[in-house]
């Protein structure tokens, strides 16, 4: 196989480092110049591209001993890339100037290829041709947001609901995403795909790599060599791969482990001579780490939002490296340079160029921001406008083509910006004398122009020539097929698209799964602590169970809870299965492994971890509780618990595979779990179940497992009847012949109860059920696993096509506002439109002097900022620039008072005085992350900011008018009523960025506007729009400080001043930029660095100071040059002058005009506005409310039907308690929904509270109030079926009390979830705390173990502190008080009265002494005794009283009050700083 190592870029700045001496380098370069007079090289590039092909033949002669060379190269790379294990960001590593031995990518790649050729590995080359390609998808239309009532209405549309649950059904209107694309890309060629966001670039890349899922139809022809798309997908799926824009990885694996796993599945069967699998693996990993300059992260975990790991830029590089390991022949890279600095992005592009040249791959690349040097790496360019192909041809001729159409280019505009700009009606300009009338200006007209051009004719000729070439070069495709087979390892079927056989996939995945589980220390620690803690609690509660009638029922309760707890430990598999879909889908298209292999590997590894945890749990429970001391019974106990866990694990994974989203999964799981618990045989015995429920026993892991555990425990157990259980009992009743034990299975005249008899009479369980149930459980586990494997292989969920933007329906007010905005859009075409109509004023001047910032590190302290000086004036736009990791965001945070750890020194002043108490309120800070409440519309988000952050004295009408101006300024007219949504389903990245800026502008900052990377992740046109907006604001008088990452010339010329930082937080320049950057460039020129005339000053100055991977210009440190310069002294003088001048102006005007108060509005107004927003959000979050309501109704309905029309029998007394006990499941279903909702709202609150929008109290109160309507509705819908279907007492006094208890339980659960979420840093940790809390509440409330039987330690305090103690006591006594009991024939205890006595005469002393129950007939000698006469006698054994029910209700209400108090305190004091401390604790594990 033509195996290509996973490589992409050089990590150093030299051009040809493979040559040992400078003279050899010059001689070699001279030879190449003669052979390639038109070769293209890049200024200060880390990778030389055009020389690659010329050097190839030269290097072939140099590598004479292939095997020896391969070994040496491996050792060389291994030495050069030994991982350091540091966790610092790559951008903070030393610059290339300080690096050791240089490393050359070209030499390594050519050496690898040469070694492969010598080993007889055939070359893989395949081109792609597409013709009349049309792709259709769903969405892209104006869809109105659905609300909570809509969810209820849609649910009763049963057929459509079922279709949606299965992932089918209507998803919107079909539309064309791409239309009539045609082109050809031959092996060894690269094409750059350009287009505005939403134009179809991603769809084209997916389609061209055969990623067709999610699109409704794909028409036209796509050929991969001689293979059509279907054949190619079937036989060579892994040869066409797509690198998505998002980075999806296992967060607990290290970088090296992530790449190592990819190589475990992709290491070829045929390798260079003498290179073993282990050597090949290590060699490629080290090469990748070296190429991407991430050697220091080799042993650092990838991480995610919960786990601290590598930086975003490093994670992006790991994604790139992972796909390169696939060794595919057709590669598509979708905006893969996002998050990379310009130097790394350029090296990535050059690495693709080298790999494409040497390995003859076919490479498609889409980039949002591409420099001219990046553009030069490509052979062809494809330009897309609104799904239409408006140009495809040579990259070197594309610019001239669009110029010939009449489009004007701006000075210093890069070719990619120019080409994309020609498709943007607001950015393109026409040549003098030309206009839209004679220049193609619509997608259709541009297509027509291209079709009439010579480029279209040349393309047709090239496509025809390529088709003919396919017939002539059949040997190439024979080599391709042979190489594809040679890449497969031994035992891999020839028809398989995978590189390794199924058993090796399982083995590789088992190794990975073990690392995932082992390295997720926090989850493992919490799991073990929870399991061990619950085991100890169970052991102490049921400590040394007696082998008497008193321990029979509690022994069953212990077995049931043990099985249930460990079974529900598997619930996390549902979440992890759904969250892991994106990783599985990515690896599926990379052909790393079959999804079925993953599920098998997971179950094998998880079994190992589960056995260890369950073994400890079982040992504690089994021996502390004194279960049967028999080795066989003990190991059978463990076996059943483990099997129950595995069965539920497979079950939850099946749900995760089958469900299209988490809401559907939760709905389905709630129904099935409720049925499993109800039919388990503990709450209601099998013989007493409704006929329609009994069959569930045979597919119920809990029912089968519980029966097996009971048989295992009781089959050989002999119990003794206690005196309390003997009837009659007391003085005078000594003759056992006339007494009977009330425990089921007892025989008259005997105090011995065989366990088998007890099981048969009570549960209808028999000794033979044990291994029969074990076999059924094994079959269920295998069945669930089979379903898991099947659905994992056949089902795939995800989005294809464009995402849908939802809108709020227009009313009269919004219709009028939108009409006014549309009328003003005509001003949009005026490029010099000002923002003066917004009346932005900012007179104060912000200065900082000698600012230093030190943070604590394990070794002491680390200085991130060092003596930084500067100022920002009204009407000036100041850029803050520097390399990644130089401290730009840190400086912004320090200046904006957003840092809450470390030590800040220096002077930060407003008008020469310390910032006032209202500073945070008067400064707007647009953070890099666009965090918004997703269910708000754009207009609502801006109005919310204006309502709370502009002075309360400003009339609301004036605030809202100002908001309309902001909408117009930010060109958001079409999106004013659009729901912001999430990046996956909502506004695009660029649109969200504009909303972020709009929210800050709507606050009308009195002092300063900070912006952190406002152009990050945007395409060039969007970035230009953002900077143009800022330019308008500055012209209107706003003071702005903005960090920006590698702007092009057009962006850079909009700034007035520059603050430039180098690594270490040192300033290297602060001052004016000047027209055409002449002031800035003059400073550098005078200090030894001369900018070439054709270079972008913004990029060049960063290279000059060594910000990228190139060496700095000059020997002196640029920070030192600045500190000794006259410009620095001038800045200090200007700051002193500005402070004095502004202080005098403030004094003369009678003081600062800024109102000094913490919040702009009073508390009552904050509560009003925040509550309104929160209620709207809940109303629109239809799945949140409806899923909760659905779970309530289903659980209540199923429970009610299971206990349908309970009679007055003795068993029904217990069943009524179990029905009431089901109310305690409410916290379990409420906490898992409330906590994530609260956490996300808190994340938004942290962002909004940082600028003092509203108080913590207003936030917490609004969350509580917003939950009230849904809590009341859920309580009503839960109460009605649960209460009336079983036939509970219908008297208003009883039913009303019971409803109050259900409602209080609902409110208690909601406030409990909010309290837990407020006390924990994230919902994951909260979810780990929930199970023990719910278990403790349910265990100590008096049902699972009655109060008299509870150990004194727990009874003395925890029983009283358990909120559910009051719930159970109040509801049980209210239901059973005064209820007459009528035993069924099977429930009577039968015994013979002594001779010459009737039953009534014999039992009279017993009843006179307060004995419970009654006799069926007092006149006979054959006595039939019922243990209870009225319900009061039943619950008296639980130490409950009807007289205390209102006290219980009051105490239960008090628990809600305590939740609220803790919630408000936690929200007030749990700042992001406190959450950071929790985060550090989390990271320790």
Curated annotation (Swiss-Prot):
GO cellular component annotations of the record: plasma membrane
CDD domains: ABCG_PDR_domain1, ABCG_PDR_domain2
InterPro entries: AAA+_ATPase (IPR003593), ABC2_TM (IPR013525), ABC_trans_N (IPR029481), ABC_transporter-like_ATP-bd (IPR003439), ABC_transporter-like_CS (IPR017871), ABCG_dom (IPR043926), ABCG_PDR_1 (IPR034001), ABCG_PDR_2 (IPR034003)
Induction comment: Expression is highly induced in a single triazole-resistant isolate (DI16-8).
Catalytic activity from the UniProt record: fluconazole(in) + ATP + H2O = fluconazole(out) + ADP + phosphate + H(+)
Its membrane topology: Multi-pass membrane protein
Positions of region (Disordered): 1-57, 75-111
Record: residues binding ATP: 882-889
Comp. bias intervals (Polar residues): 8-24
Localization annotation: Cell membrane
Keyword flag Glycoprotein: yes
Record text on activity regulation: The efflux inhibitor FK506 does not impair the transport activity.
Family: Belongs to the ABC transporter superfamily. ABCG family. PDR (TC 3.A.1.205) subfamily.
Main function: ABC efflux transporter that confers resistance to fluconazole (FLC) but shows no resistance to other azoles. Is also able to transport rhodamine 6G (R-6G), a known substrate for many ABC transporters.
Protein name: ABC multidrug transporter I
Encoding gene, per UniProt annotation: abcI
């Amino acid at each position: 196989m033509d195996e290509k190592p996973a490589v992409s870029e050089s990590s150093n700045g030299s051009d040809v480092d493979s040559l040992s001496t400078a003279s050899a380098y010059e001689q070699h370069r001279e030879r190449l110049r003669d052979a390639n007079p038109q070769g293209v090289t890049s200024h200060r590039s880390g990778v030389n591209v055009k020389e690659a092909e010329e050097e190839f033949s030269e290097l072939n002669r140099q590598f004479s001993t292939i095997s020896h060379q391969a070994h040496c190269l491996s050792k060389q790379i291994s030495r050069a890339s030994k991982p350091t294990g540091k966790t610092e960001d790559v951008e903070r590593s030393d610059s290339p100037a300080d690096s050791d031995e240089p490393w050359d990518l070209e030499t390594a790649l050519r050496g690898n290829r040469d070694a492969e050729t010598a080993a007889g590995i055939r070359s893989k080359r395949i081109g792609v041709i597409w013709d009349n390609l049309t792709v259709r998808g769903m969405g892209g239309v104006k869809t109105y947001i659905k609300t909570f009532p809509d969810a209820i209405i849609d649910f009763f549309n049963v057929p459509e609901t079922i279709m949606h649950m299965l992932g089918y059904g209507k998803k919107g209107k079909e539309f064309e995403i791409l239309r009539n694309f045609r082109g050809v890309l031959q092996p060894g060629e690269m094409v750059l795909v350009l287009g505005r966001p939403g134009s179809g670039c991603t769809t084209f890349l997916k389609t061209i790599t055969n990623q067709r899922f999610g699109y409704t139809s794909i028409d036209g022809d796509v050929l991969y060599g001689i293979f059509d798309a279907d054949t190619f997908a079937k036989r060579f799926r892994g040869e066409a791969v797509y690198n998505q824009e998002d980075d999806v990885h296992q967060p607990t694996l290290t970088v090296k482990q992530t790449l190592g796993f990819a190589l475990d599945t992709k290491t070829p069967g045929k390798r260079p001579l003498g290179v073993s699998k282990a050597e090949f693996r290590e060699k490629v990993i080290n090469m990748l780490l070296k190429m991407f300059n991430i050697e220091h992260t080799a042993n650092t975990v990838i991480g995610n939002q919960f786990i601290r790991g590598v930086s975003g830029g490093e994670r992006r590089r790991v994604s790139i490296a992972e796909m390169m390991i696939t060794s595919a022949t057709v590669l598509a890279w979708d905006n893969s340079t996002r998050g990379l600095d310009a130097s790394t992005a350029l090296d990535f592009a050059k690495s693709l160029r080298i790999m494409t040249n040497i390995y003859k791959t076919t490479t498609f690349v889409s980039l949002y921001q591409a420099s001219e040097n990046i553009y030069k790496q490509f052979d062809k360019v494809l330009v897309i406008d609104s799904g239409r192909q408006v140009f495809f041809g040579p990259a070197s001729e594309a610019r001239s083509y669009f110029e010939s159409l009449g489009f004007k280019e701006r000075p210093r505009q890069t070719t990619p910006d120019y080409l994309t700009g020609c498709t943007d009606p607001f950015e393109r300009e026409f040549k003098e004398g030309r206009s839209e009338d004679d220049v193609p200006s619509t997608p259709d007209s541009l297509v027509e122009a291209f079709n009439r051009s010579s480029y279209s004719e040349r393309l047709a000729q090239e496509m025809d020539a390529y088709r003919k070439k396919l017939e002539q070069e059949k040997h190439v495709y024979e080599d391709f097929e042979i190489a594809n087979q040679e890449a497969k390892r031994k035992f891999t079927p020839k028809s398989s698209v995978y590189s390794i056989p199924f058993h090796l996939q399982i083995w590789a995945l088992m190794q990975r799964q073990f690392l995932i589980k082992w390295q997720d220390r926090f989850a493992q620690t919490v799991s073990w602590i929870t399991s061990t803690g619950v085991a100890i609690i169970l052991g102490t509660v049921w400590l040394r169970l007696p082998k008497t009638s008193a321990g029979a029922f509690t022994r069953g309760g212990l077995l049931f809870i043990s099985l249930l707890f460990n079974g529900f430990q598997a619930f996390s598999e549902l979440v992890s299965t759904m969250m892991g879909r994106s990783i599985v889908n990515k690896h599926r298209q990379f052909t790393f492994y079959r999804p079925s292999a993953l599920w098998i590997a997971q179950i094998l590894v998880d079994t190992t971890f589960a056995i260890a945890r369950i073994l400890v749990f079982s040992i504690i429970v089994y021996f502390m509780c004194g279960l049967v001391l028999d080795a066989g019974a003990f190991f059978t106990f463990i076996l059943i618990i483990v099997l129950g866990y595995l069965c539920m694990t497979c079950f939850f994974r099946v749900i995760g595979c089958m469900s299209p989203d988490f809401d559907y999964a939760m709905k389905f799981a709630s129904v099935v779990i409720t049925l499993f618990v109800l039919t388990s045989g503990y709450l209601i015995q099998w013989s007493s179940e409704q006929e329609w429920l009994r069959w569930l026993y045979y597919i119920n892991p809990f029912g089968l497992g519980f029966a097996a555990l009971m048989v295992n425990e009781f089959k050989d157990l002999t119990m003794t009847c206690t005196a309390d259980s003997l009837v009659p009992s007391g003085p005078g009743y000594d003759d056992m012949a006339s007494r009977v034990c009330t425990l089921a299975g007892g025989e008259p005249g005997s105090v011995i109860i065989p366990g088998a008899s007890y099981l048969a009479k009570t549960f209808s369980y028999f000794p033979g059920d044990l291994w029969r149930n074990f076999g059924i459980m094994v079959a269920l586990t295998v069945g669930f696993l089979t379903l898991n494997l099947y659905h994992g292989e056949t089902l795939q969920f995800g989005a294809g096509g464009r995402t849908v933007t939802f809108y709020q329906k227009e009313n009269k007010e919004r219709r009028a506002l939108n009409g006014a905005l549309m009328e003003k859009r005509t001003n949009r075409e005026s490029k010099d439109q000002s923002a003066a109509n917004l009346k932005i004023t900012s007179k104060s001047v912000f200065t900082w002097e000698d600012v230093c910032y030190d943070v604590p590190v394990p070794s002491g302290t680390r200085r991130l900022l060092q003596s930084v000086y500067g100022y920002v004036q009204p009407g000036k736009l100041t850029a803050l620039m520097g390399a990644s990791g130089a401290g730009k965001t840190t400086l912004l945070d320090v200046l904006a008072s957003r840092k809450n750890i470390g030590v800040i020194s220096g002077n930060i002043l407003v008008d020469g005085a310390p910032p006032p108490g209202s500073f945070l309120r008067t400064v707007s800070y647009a953070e890099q992350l666009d965090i918004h409440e997703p269910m708000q519309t754009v207009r609502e988000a801006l109005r919310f900011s204006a309502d709370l952050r502009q002075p309360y004295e400003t009339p609301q009408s004036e605030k809202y008018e100002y908001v309309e101006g902001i909408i117009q300024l930010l060109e958001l007219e079409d999106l004013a009523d659009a729901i912001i949504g999430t990046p996956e389903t909502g506004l695009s990245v660029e649109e969200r960025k504009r909303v972020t800026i709009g929210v800050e502008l709507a606050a009308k900052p009195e002092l300063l506007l900070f912006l952190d990377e406002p152009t990050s992740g945007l395409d060039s046109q969007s970035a230009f729009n953002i900077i143009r907006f800022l330019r308008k604001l500055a012209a209107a008088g706003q003071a702005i400080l903005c960090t920006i990452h590698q702007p092009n010339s057009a962006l850079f010329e909009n700034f007035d001043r520059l603050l430039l930082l180098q690594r270490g937080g040192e300033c290297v320049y602060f001052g004016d930029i000047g027209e055409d950057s002449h002031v800035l460039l003059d400073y550098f020129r005078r200090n030894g660095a001369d900018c070439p005339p054709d270079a972008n000053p913004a990029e060049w100055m960063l290279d000059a100071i060594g910000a990228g991977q190139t060496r700095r210009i000059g020997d002196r440190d640029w920070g030192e040059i600045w500190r000794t310069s006259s410009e620095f002294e001038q800045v200090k003088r200007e700051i002193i002058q500005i402070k004095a001048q502004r202080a005098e102006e403030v004094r003369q005007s009678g003081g600062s005009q800024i109102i000094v108060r913490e919040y702009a509005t009073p508390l009552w107004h904050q509560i009003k506005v925040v509550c309104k927003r929160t209620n709207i959000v809940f109303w629109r979050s239809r799945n949140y409310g409806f899923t909760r309501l659905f779970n309530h109704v289903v659980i209540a309905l199923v429970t009610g039907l299971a206990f349908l029309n309970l009679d007055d029998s003795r068993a029904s007394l217990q069943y009524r308690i179990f029905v009431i006990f089901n109310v305690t499941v409410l916290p379990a279903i409420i906490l898992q929904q409330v906590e994530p909702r609260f956490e996300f709202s808190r994340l938004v609150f942290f962002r909004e509270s940082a600028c003092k929008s509203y108080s913590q109290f207003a936030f917490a109160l609004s969350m509580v109030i917003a939950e009230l309507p849904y809590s009341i509705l859920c309580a009503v819908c839960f109460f009605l079926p649960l209460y009336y279907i079983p036939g509970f007492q219908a008297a208003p006094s009883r039913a009303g009390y019971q409803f109050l208890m259900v409602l209080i339980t609902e409110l208690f659960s909601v406030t409990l979830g909010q309290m837990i979420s407020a006390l924990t840093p994230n919902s994951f940790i909260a979810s780990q705390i929930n199970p023990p809390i719910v278990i403790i509440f349910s265990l100590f409330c008096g049902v699972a173990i009655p109060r008299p039987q509870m150990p004194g330690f727990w009874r003395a305090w925890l029983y009283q502190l358990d909120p559910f103690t009051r719930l159970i006591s109040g509801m049980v006594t209210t239901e059973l008080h005064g209820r007459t009991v009528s035993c069924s024939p099977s429930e009577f205890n039968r015994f013979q009265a002594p001779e010459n006595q009737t039953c009534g005469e014999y039992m009279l002393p017993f009843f006179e002494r307060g004995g419970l129950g009654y006799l069926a007939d007092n006149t006979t000698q054959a006595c039939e005794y019922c243990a209870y006469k009225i319900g009061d006698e039943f619950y008296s054994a639980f130490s409950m009283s009807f007289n205390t029910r209102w006290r219980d209700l009051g105490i239960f209400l008090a628990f809600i009050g305590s939740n609220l108090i803790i919630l408000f305190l936690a929200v007030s004091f749990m700042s992001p700083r406190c959450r950071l401390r929790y985060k550090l604790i989390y990271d320790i594990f």
